[in-house]
Regions:
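Peripheral, non-AAA+ core regions of ATP-driven protein-machinery
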Residues: 1-219, 223, 332, 472, ...
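Basic, amphipathic alpha-helical bundle interface domains used for macromolecular binding and assembly
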Residues: 40-45, 58-60, 67-77, 290-291, ...
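Short loop/turn elements that form and flank the Walker-type P-loop nucleotide-binding site
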Residues: 59-62, 99-100, 132, 150, ...
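Catalytic P-loop NTPase motifs of RecA-like helicase/translocase cores
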Residues: 112, 306-313, 356
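P-loop NTPase nucleotide-binding/switch module
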Residues: 171-210, 214, 241-296
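Walker A/P-loop
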Residues: 220-261, 326
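Walker B catalytic acidic pair
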Residues: 301, 307-308, 319
Length: 512
């Protein structure tokens, strides 16, 4: 007897349809799984056999061939345990059900027949809906994630026995309630941190506000204990709330990476990823024998924070250049390649020198000019070229620390950021960009033209401050964002002056 069960496989952050074809015939005994399975799938024979024995079913002494089609697509993971087990039961006439043809099955079987959660559920359910399937059977711990997708019934089961009872219509089922319609995308109480927690540092907070408003990458240079990490961790709290599309994309990435905990659904808060400086290239950009998303993709639609940036290996930092420029990462293997989104805001921090006290107001730096220069050279020019804002962070004074003055909250800053982003959305409507940081040179001439006064100001600054040529476009982009924060139609001299002040590391005399 032949039977076909619907399932799926993950490719990048999307899913493709996989048919689990089961054929039972004479002429031998055994279970044979074909169709480019990995070792996890090959081991499913033992899990399925034990689950049958502990659930009251039998693996008949016949030749059972399971084909995972299409055969040229690599399949991996334990999510095929359930569709294979159901297919064998139907093909051996131990189970009959009218639900098979229009249902998808995903889940890992334990030896006692219970179901365990799997990763990649959200893209799999989205694919099931696109294929016109009516329902998806899955482990209960994945239900909250699956219920993000509307238009398909999500049915959580705890064991093989419970599933068979439902399929045989001996037990009623209640589909999970879909969560999208009840989600408030503008919810502001998602974060525990707040800008109001940080005393002083108005100059740095202003720079972070500009970075959030225009999607600009930013680097903070300051001595140890000046508050760089504390400020960086509060960046997501002032960024605009994620749109539904952004939330779905973010959830898909974390789902594929297996980073969504049990019983968790749509991710609403912007990601904040802070990899250790010993992180490898693969961990940072993604990869592996079977590619998985790296930190740059897990930070998609959020923040990637590189604390003490010069401590990262130079080869590790250099691989950031492609995702910073293209906002996605391509991982190639011999026979295929996968793309992962990598549209993140980079926040980097660093000490100004090896000892950490160059330009400190009270402590003396013990580093030579040459050692400061060598330390700064750990970050290459092409990588620094992709960072729009450089801001020096000075230690908070005792006066500011003891002040009772109420600091501005993240909600207040976010209101201005959202207004500026709305202006940019209108400006770039119909284009494939959505914020000022994404403009190229031709777009700058169109959307951020300079008056004669501003052009002369920028030219004088380039000469007097010895700014490098690569700073020119960056300054204009940041100035355009500053103008947006003030709801100004054109860039004015004060906007340009402030933007020029955010190019500390471009000055040729830095560290000398």
């Amino acid at each position: 007897m032949f039977i076909k069960i619907h399932s799926g496989a993950i490719s990048g952050i999307e899913a493709v349809e996989v048919s689990v074809e089961v054929n039972v015939a004479g002429g031998g005994i055994g279970l044979f799984i074909v169709g480019l399975p990995d070792n996890t799938i090959k081991e499913s024979e033992q899990r399925i056999q034990a689950a049958y024995e502990n659930s009251g079913y039998r693996l008949l002494a016949k030749k059972i061939v399971v084909n995972l089609a299409p055969a040229d697509l690599r399949k991996e993971g334990s999510l095929y345990d359930l569709p294979i087990a159901v297919g064998i039961l139907v093909a051996t006439e131990q189970l009959t059900s009218k639900f098979i043809e229009d249902s998808m099955f995903i889940g890992e079987l334990s030896l006692n027949g219970e179901l365990r959660g799997v990763k990649g559920v959200l893209p799999l359910v989205a694919m099931a809906r696109a294929r016109g399937l009516k329902r998806v059977f899955m482990p209960k711990e994945n239900v909250a994630e699956g219920a993000v997708v509307e238009g398909v019934e999500i049915i959580g089961v705890s064991s093989l026995v419970e599933l068979c009872e439902i399929l045989s219509e001996r037990m009623p089922y209640t589909p999970a309630e879909h969560v999208i319609s009840s989600v408030d995308m503008a919810e502001e109480s998602l974060y525990a941190e707040d800008f109001a927690d940080v005393k002083g540092q108005a100059y740095v907070k202003r720079a972070l506000e500009i970075a959030a408003a225009g999607g600009h990458n930013i680097i903070m240079i300051g001595s140890p204990g000046s508050g760089k990490t504390m400020l960086a961790r509060r960046m997501p709290t002032i960024m605009p709330p994620m749109t539904l599309d952004e939330a779905l994309e973010t959830t898909k990435i974390h789902s594929v990476a297996g980073k969504i905990g049990a019983h968790r659904g749509l991710i609403l808060e912007r990601p904040f990823r802070a990899p250790h400086h010993l992180t490898s290239q693969v961990a940072l950009i993604g990869g592996g024998t079977y590619p998985q998303p790296g930190e740059v993709s897990l930070a998609n639609n959020g923040v990637l924070f590189l604390d003490e940036m010069p401590e990262f290996g130079r080869n590790v930092l250099e691989v950031l250049r492609q995702p910073l420029e293209d906002r996605h990462i391509t991982i190639s293997r011999a026979k295929y390649s996968v793309d992962y989104p990598a549209n993140f805001t980079l926040i980097a921090s660093m000490n100004p020198c090896p000892c950490g006290y160059y330009n400190h107001p009270t402590k003396e730096c013990t580093c030579s000019a040459a050692s400061v220069h060598r330390y700064m050279s750990h970050i290459s020019g092409p990588l620094m070229d992709r960072i729009d804002i450089h801001v020096e962070v000075t230690p908070v004074s005792i006066k500011d620390m003891s002040s009772e003055r109420r600091e501005e909250s993240s909600a207040d800053v976010r209101c201005r950021v959202v207004s500026a982003r709305e202006l940019q959305r209108q400006r770039f409507e119909g284009l494939d960009i959505h914020c000022n940081a994404m403009m190229n040179s031709s777009m700058l001439r169109r959307f951020a033209p300079l008056t004669k006064e501003c052009s002369e100001l920028l030219e004088r600054a380039m000469q007097r401050l010895n700014l490098s040529a690569r700073a020119y476009d960056r300054i204009i982009k940041v100035a355009r964002t500053i103008a947006d924060l003030e709801a100004k139609e054109s860039i004015e001299p004060q906007h340009l002056s402030e933007a020029i002040g955010y190019r500390s590391l471009d000055r040729e005399n830095w560290g000398r």
